[in-house]
A protein has these predicted regions:
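Short aromatic loop motif centered on NTY/YTY
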Residues: 122-136, 144-147, 154, 165
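Bacterial signal peptide processing site
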Residues: 15-17
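Beta-propeller blade signature
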Residues: 99-106, 154-163
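N-terminal accessory alpha/beta regions
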Residues: 26-81, 90
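Short beta-strand elements that form the blades of beta-propeller/WD-repeat-like
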Residues: 82-89, 138-147
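Short N-terminal edge-element motif at the start of the domain
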Residues: 85, 94-134
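Structural signature of eukaryotic scaffold interfaces centered on beta-propeller domains
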Residues: 66-85, 125-137
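Sec-dependent N-terminal signal peptides
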Residues: 3-13
Length: 165
């Protein structure tokens, strides 16, 4: 009986990881299309599919090797493994505009939020390319490059409250 339960859990886990793998392949195709075609519909499809993928709890530990290849996509994780930041270039071209999503665990659930300049005040705008997360007592500091006018290093702080990030 115990063997059957373990087998069912293993098969279920493999199917879930396979689902994320399939979504990653679709994201990879859309990423290339949005940068080659410069068409808004590809950007919108990519963003929508990325949010679907990130809202799946299995994505929290998935490595996304195909998307990270050739610097298309950057993923950083906090030392306590509670928070991940996904950044990618949204426009292509010489000026670098990045979009970032934060994914974190709260009470056993996966929460996904789009970051903007200075985190929430300009939600939905373009961000830095984040490369490091530093932990404090009740905060995470995100370090990234802001590349519109220069390669300035930017630090955004996320405060952790009991009910929200």
């Amino acid at each position: 009986m115990r063997t059957i339960i373990l087998l069912i859990l293993l098969v279920s886990s493999c199917q879930n990881e396979q689902k994320i793998s399939i979504l990653e392949k679709e994201l990879n195709i859309l990423f290339d299309a949005k940068n080659n075609e410069r068409d808004e519909k590809y950007k919108e499809r990519f963003d929508s599919l990325l949010q679907v993928c990130l809202n799946d709890s299995n994505s929290f530990t998935y490595p996304f090797h195909d998307l990270k290849r050739n610097g298309k996509f950057n993923i950083i994780q906090s030392p306590d493994k509670i928070l991940r930041v996904y950044s990618y270039e949204d426009f292509g071209g010489t000026m670098k505009f990045y979009k970032s999503y934060i994914q974190y665990k709260r009470n056993g659930k996966i929460i996904v939020e789009q970051l903007g300049d200075s985190i929430y005040p300009f939600k939905g705008r373009y961000t830095s390319l984040y490369y490091q997360i530093e932990m404090g007592k009740n905060e995470y500091k995100l370090y990234g490059y802001w590349q519109i006018s220069s390669n300035e290093i930017e630090c955004d702080t996320i405060i952790i409250n009991e009910n929200e990030l």
